[in-house]
């Protein structure tokens, strides 16, 4: 199941010697090794993205996988499942931000293959620390607080690794919502380049 915003899906009709075949647009693009993350991140979204990446790896372990990201973020554990798979699969993973990549969306954007992390000119990127809350007895709140702190340290460490920024700067910048333009995201190290108007900077479909 391609991950995209809800609503009716455009259909692509292909003609062949066996007759016409209809595909929804996202399934057709999956054949071109293009995956969309166009919604919040939860367990169902993670399962679908992981399955698509593993399928494309099995199809051809040498051709790039492209992931288009327009996501407000979501579950940290679900996002880390996607991230770990991105690092595990044999093909390079090209990440392309269109619209907004925020929170876990920005983290996944930065986790693409170095040199192949892109953004469209008017995209926005936002990083911040994990959000969380706890209710119940004091011991339960303490357990949740420790887990949130652990996840924060894990994400900050990985962001420092992918951006080249010092860990203390990552910790300071993610203490509150931190918005960046594509050019600022390049300077920060979250992405590698901005796609220009001609498309020459990187959105390429394998033929």
From Swiss-Prot:
Q: Which residues form the active site?
A: 103 (nucleophile), 128
Q: GO biological process annotations for this chain's record?
A: protein quality control for misfolded or incompletely synthesized proteins
List the subcellular locations.
Answer: Cytoplasm
Gene Ontology CC annotations of this record: cytoplasm; endopeptidase Clp complex
Keywords from the UniProt entry: Cytoplasm, Hydrolase, Protease, Serine protease
Enzymatic reactions: Hydrolysis of proteins to small peptides in the presence of ATP and magnesium. alpha-casein is the usual test substrate. In the absence of ATP, only oligopeptides shorter than five residues are hydrolyzed (such as succinyl-Leu-Tyr-|-NHMec, and Leu-Tyr-Leu-|-Tyr-Trp, in which cleavage of the -Tyr-|-Leu- and -Tyr-|-Trp bonds also occurs)
Q: Does the keyword S-adenosyl-L-methionine apply?
A: no
Q: What is its EC number?
A: 3.4.21.92
- Which Pfam families does UniProt cross-reference here? CLP_protease (PF00574)
Query: Matching Gene3D superfamilies, A to Z?
Result: 2-enoyl-CoA Hydratase, Chain A, domain 1
Please tell me which top-level EC class this enzyme sits in.
Answer: hydrolase
Q: Name one GO molecular function term.
A: serine-type endopeptidase activity
- Check the record and name the InterPro entries matching this protein: ClpP, ClpP/crotonase-like_dom_sf, ClpP/TepA, ClpP_His_AS
What family is it from? Belongs to the peptidase S14 family.
Which proteins does it associate with, and in what oligomeric form? Answer: Fourteen ClpP subunits assemble into 2 heptameric rings which stack back to back to give a disk-like structure with a central cavity, resembling the structure of eukaryotic proteasomes.
Its job: Cleaves peptides in various proteins in a process that requires ATP hydrolysis. Has a chymotrypsin-like activity. Plays a major role in the degradation of misfolded proteins.
Q: What is this protein called?
A: ATP-dependent Clp protease proteolytic subunit 2
């Amino acid at each position: 199941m391609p991950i995209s915003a809800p609503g009716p899906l455009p259909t692509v009709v292909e003609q062949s010697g066996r007759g016409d075949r209809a595909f929804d647009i996202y399934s057709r693009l999956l054949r071109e090794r293009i995956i969309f993350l166009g919604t919040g991140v939860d367990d169902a979204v993670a399962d679908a993205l992981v399955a698509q990446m593993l399928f494309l790896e099995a199809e051809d372990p040498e051709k790039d996988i492209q992931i288009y990201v327009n996501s407000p973020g979501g579950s940290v554990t679900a996002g880390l499942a996607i991230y770990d798979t991105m690092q595990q699969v044999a093909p390079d993973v090209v990440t392309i931000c269109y619209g907004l990549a925020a929170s876990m969306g920005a983290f996944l954007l930065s986790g693409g293959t170095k040199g192949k992390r892109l953004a469209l000119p008017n995209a926005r990127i936002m990083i911040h620390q994990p959000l969380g809350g706890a209710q119940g007895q004091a011991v339960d709140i303490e357990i949740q607080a420790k887990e949130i702190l652990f996840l924060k340290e894990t994400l900050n460490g990985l962001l420092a690794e992918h951006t080249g920024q010092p860990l203390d700067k990552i910790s300071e910048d993610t203490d509150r919502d931190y918005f960046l333009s594509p050019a600022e995201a390049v300077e920060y190290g979250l992405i590698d380049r901005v796609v220009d108007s001609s498309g020459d900077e990187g959105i390429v479909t394998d033929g």
